[in-house]
Amino acid sequence: MALRRLSKSVSSAIKAQYTLSRPSPLLRSRSLSSSPHYTSIGRPTNSFIGKINNSSITHATTTHGQLFPLSSPRRFCTTTAQVNQNEFTEMAWEGLINAFDAARESKQQIVESEHLMKALLEQKDGMARKIFTKAGIDNSSVLQATDLFISKQPTVSDASGQRLGSSLSVILENAKRHKKDMLDSYVSVEHFLLAYYSDTRFGQEFFRDMKLDIQVLKDAIKDVRGDQRVTDRNPESKYQALEKYGNDLTEMARRGKLDPVIGRDDEIRRCIQILCRRTKNNPVIIGEPGVGKTAIAEGLAQRIVRGDVPEPLMNRKLISLDMGSLLAGAKFRGDFEERLKAVMKEVSASNGQTILFIDEIHTVVGAGAMDGAMDASNLLKPMLGRGELRCIGATTLTEYRKYIEKDPALERRFQQVLCVQPSVEDTISILRGLRERYELHHGVTISDSALVSAAVLADRYITERFLPDKAIDLVDEAGAKLKMEITSKPTELDGIDRAVIKLEMEKLSLKNDTDKASKERLQKIENDLSTLKQKQKELNVQWEKEKSLMTKIRSFKEEIDRVNLEIESAEREYDLNRAAELKYGTLLSLQRQLEEAEKNLTNFRQFGQSLLREVVTDLDIAEIVSKWTGIPLSNLQQSEREKLVMLEEVLHHRVIGQDMAVKSVADAIRRSRAGLSDPNRPIASFMFMGPTGVGKTELAKALAGYLFNTENAIVRVDMSEYMEKHSVSRLVGAPPGYVGYEEGGQLTEVVRRRPYSVVLFDEIEKAHPDVFNILLQLLDDGRITDSQGRTVSFKNCVVIMTSNIGSHHILETLRNNEDSKEAVYEIMKRQVVELARQNFRPEFMNRIDEYIVFQPLDSNEISKIVELQMRRVKNSLEQKKIKLQYTKEAVDLLAQLGFDPNYGARPVKRVIQQMVENEIAVGILKGDFAEEDTVLVDVDHLASDNKLVIKKLESNASAEEMAA
């Protein structure tokens, strides 16, 4: 039944008058003229107060319990009980209104006390349910008994004209009496429950059957209400405030719900020391996200449960306050403050037995403050300063500086406990302590090598997060991945299932064919199906057996974990008989069963290949890191080993010539993949110098293509865009107050999202000198701090800078020197590097790993480049289903036309575009070349100037035949 809110303008005038057709003994015992609750019936004006059973309710009276509007004719009436909605709490009034609905659903006209009880019990999170639970009464049995009583009452076919029963009238009057006795301002649900002891129709016999004494009920009400009084229409929000808005960490530790806390002894001891102070006994744990601030509070809770704390903290409760729950649902001004005051009152009333833990404590600054109201921090300050409220806070360094330090009055009430990131060795210890929990959750076994690998790889490659959180996440995700594989169908079995389905479909399509070939194919399919189905059956049996054995092992481990918790609980309570029975009886039996199940699984796997894998290894951890960062960290397979050894050949597929440059780059990659490079610097840093068009940028693209299987993974920064002083800041981000501050730097943002990449600074000599100040830190420490203070790691990048400095020296040296190629290269390199030293500052040059000088291309290398470009044209035409063939003479002619030592290989591309691609494009548009045609590129030997000729190749003729 919907209960409509009253508008403020008419709420003060809302009343419902009920005429009692048969006054109760309680009413008869009073003088009607002197009772303030009764008045003779007048004719008050109608005021809308809500709806009952979809009928509008106004000021009304009842004749024999029937509700009538006051304006309607009344045949008789005796007395009138005035019931004002504003005298009831929201939950009590809602229960009263819903009682009419309960009666209507039961097809009963008279609304009695049992209908009110049913309505109160059906309220979600209602007070009646909480009180009965505290009294040790099962709510479902109470509701069942109420329904049984209601079902025995007479029913009518039409329950629209509902009447108010005398028993409910008695409940209403007695509830008001209990309200006065308890010094409350409003009638609440607990007053209704106490009034049932005066109800001779239903309540007295009902509570007697439930064996619920009135004193037990009063004690339960006191437990739920505490010291709170009903002073507003929504008092339930202040009852059991700590239980409603907090989580008891000590109780969770007692039940084994918290993860074990390894280490952090100094921080926990410091917190205990601060908590034992007389005033300002409030530690605040400060540290980066993920270093274990909340774990310190959980570790303290576990110590309290074990009794491993000083006397002032023995048997204390540590409650984690949920600020979100405090704020949620606080619709009106003052609701939040009342809830928080109720929490503080409960903590203060516990006389130091309760310690609050507020995670993300910076949220209390400004929480609940609106329209000039005080925020939560101002409500907490007085009690924090006097030592009446012991509170542990936790927040990050940034948020502490941003929120807490700006309020000195709040800051001085807290004592800082700094929580630093643990070392890799400490992280490994933490992971070993957590291993059992994650093994139990995922049903897998986690090897020690996986834990070590998680700590080491997380520290090196996941740079923007902190230990131990990132290492724990790696182990958790690797366990989840393996669990997914265990619960899913094995790859081998899944492949067979798909093959069977494919053959079944093929069999159906061939079933009606009568030719010999189809029958032979059908027979072959049936034979294959028979073999596959037999193998499928065997694998299914093996899979189910393996899965059942692994499930049994997991259930034994869970049972052992539960028994260990019971042993700890018994030892804490000094129930030594129970502890001995569990430890030397139940636990030993379970351990024997676990060993037997593990032995059965091992024996089963000895007879065939295992379909399921249950051990998380360092390979799994490396695979997860690779997926997170894009860094290829999985163990080197034999194919990749061979590929690394032959890396020069791989790069030479795209870069023609430049043997010295390719070898230097390949050596750097091999060092990195073998784990020999300096972990605190970029993988390698090169300066490529040489004439234009000799392959400097192409080598960088080829390297990116090898590392990522796509050359788009290269981070290319064209330094000609950074020639002005004001443009330099774009690399790391605009300073505060400038446009683009929130967007970050054009270099740093890309590398943050793709930490393993080839960073190419193209034409570095064109950059403004201030750019080199930024590059110094990048080349030396492998990191840059952007404009927002974030540290961006370049430790997994290959940094390449290209420059055209000294290109004229290179050309002159090659023209005028007759020595060997190696000797000429050394002379040329010395000259170019010396020229670079004159153009760049010494501190910049000193940080580059290697200077690589590219040589001009000769005619043979240009011919190879022509072949590369022609293969590119051929691949483009194949997409249009047109084949391309070319003769050696055509390649030589194109190389001759495109060769210019001063410009490198770029003229080749222009020549091929003009003489080959343009002609073929015109032929396609004219219709000379269509699909399935073969286009021949050849030299016209009959012409005096050996022109290039492009024509359609006749079928069954090769390029060599046409050339002949």
Swiss-Prot record:
Clp R domain residues: 83-227
UniProt name for this protein: Chaperone protein ClpB4, mitochondrial
Record's subcellular location: Mitochondrion
Chain segment of the transit peptide: 1-39
InterPro entries with a match to the protein in the record: AAA+_ATPase, ATPase_AAA_core, Chaperonin_ClpB, Clp_ATPase_C, Clp_N_dom_sf, Clp_R_dom, ClpA/B, ClpA/B_CS1
Organism: Arabidopsis thaliana (Mouse-ear cress)
Expression induction: By heat stress.
GO cellular component terms, semicolon-separated: chloroplast; chloroplast envelope; chloroplast stroma; mitochondrion
